[in-house]
């Protein structure tokens, strides 16, 4: 063995702290179709080279530790280690870089979003060598996505269940979100559904509080939607929030919803957790329930531009874990969301095959194969005058959800629902006739009123 080879071979076995880039930075690596690929926005500490920072992320999210251990010799490090295979600077940010990391598929348990995130983001984000770290995107290989059930039903099956085609669906979050009795809550549900909405919704923090226990709410809401169905001849739904303190309690609520014969339940998938969400999604498919997903707590994870995780990653994870709807921003409402970036992850939710497009924040081509699609929900600070823009931006396969935009109508809940339904149908008809919603939107709404 030459002295040079001997030195390189022994580096990994010296006592003390080692440089990660010696083992985990591999710019010559050619990614495999079966690799999970990750794009991290890395902000190294001053004096830390980007190659070392990227390699540290690859190491700490796969097989690495801070020093050499003798048990490395009992397995194949080359087979199981993550590899930082490319680094590029971020335009306009001198201290930030995009580090691309490839993970062998054998590192991950089949059908487990929980295990995937525990590995990829579970430990590396607290690493000293990094000032900040953000997971921008993941490429999920088809060999891994096929181990997931995904959404309980998907877009086409939902439309068939509801017998509603050719337009976005309309929803409303019942307000005030907290404080109503179950009977008054059910009354508001009835008025909104009777007025023309397809769905009403529990807010994310409506679970089973002293002022309104979950069983009472479920009963009054079921009564309301059956009454509205009888009067309108349309299938109606209310998102009954099954989120609870334990998985057992969550499943008990979902079972009761099924016994009532309602079409849809709801879950807060980030606060409830991916294990609970996947369990509920499996139950919903087996028992014919649609599953609405709220993303409560997402901004804690995704709002900072240089640290955390972009929502497109959470959206991909939800499609794998399971949900038929998920809140996805509005572009035009009160909550943050850039149009191109929002439409990028909307396509990741709905479409089967999405090409890489950095202008929309999509770092990798994603092929979902046969995994059902998820309806994006536009909700948050929107009202009837936003209808033309929402119809143009989201197209037909979306849920447009107006809370205050329905219940804030000066004539009451039912007239507010009527106004939204009339505006939606006017916008869809105008679009189908070739009119320009962006330019003529307000005029179209005035004509309909």
UniProtKB/Swiss-Prot annotation:
Function field: RuBisCO catalyzes two reactions: the carboxylation of D-ribulose 1,5-bisphosphate, the primary event in carbon dioxide fixation, as well as the oxidative fragmentation of the pentose substrate in the photorespiration process. Both reactions occur simultaneously and in competition at the same active site.
Keyword Oxidoreductase: yes
List of residues that carry N6-carboxylysine: 201
Modified residue annotations for N-acetylproline: 3
Organism: Hippocratea richardiana
Annotated residues for binding of Mg(2+): 201, 203-204
Note, other: The basic functional RuBisCO is composed of a large chain homodimer in a 'head-to-tail' conformation. In form I RuBisCO this homodimer is arranged in a barrel-like tetramer with the small subunits forming a tetrameric 'cap' on each end of the 'barrel'.
Entry EC number(s): 4.1.1.39
Gene: rbcL
Key words of the record: Acetylation, Calvin cycle, Carbon dioxide fixation, Chloroplast, Disulfide bond, Lyase, Magnesium, Metal-binding, Methylation, Monooxygenase, Oxidoreductase, Photorespiration, Photosynthesis, Plastid
Family, per entry: Belongs to the RuBisCO large chain family. Type I subfamily.
Entry PTM: The disulfide bond which can form in the large chain dimeric partners within the hexadecamer appears to be associated with oxidative stress and protein turnover.
Modified residues (N6,N6,N6-trimethyllysine): 14
Note accompanying the cofactor annotation: Binds 1 Mg(2+) ion per subunit.
Site (Transition state stabilizer): 334
Protein's recorded name: Ribulose bisphosphate carboxylase large chain
GO cellular component: chloroplast
Annotated propeptide span(s): 1-2
Oligomer and partners: Heterohexadecamer of 8 large chains and 8 small chains; disulfide-linked. The disulfide link is formed within the large subunit homodimers.
A Pfam short name: RuBisCO_large
Major subcellular location class: plastid
SUPFAM superfamilies associated with the record: RuBisCo, C-terminal domain (SSF51649), RuBisCO, large subunit, small (N-terminal) domain (SSF54966)
GO molecular function: magnesium ion binding; monooxygenase activity; ribulose-bisphosphate carboxylase activity
Catalytic activity: 2 (2R)-3-phosphoglycerate + 2 H(+) = D-ribulose 1,5-bisphosphate + CO2 + H2O; D-ribulose 1,5-bisphosphate + O2 = 2-phosphoglycolate + (2R)-3-phosphoglycerate + 2 H(+)
Localization in the cell: Plastid, Chloroplast
Needed co-factor(s): Mg(2+)
Catalytic site positions: 175, 294
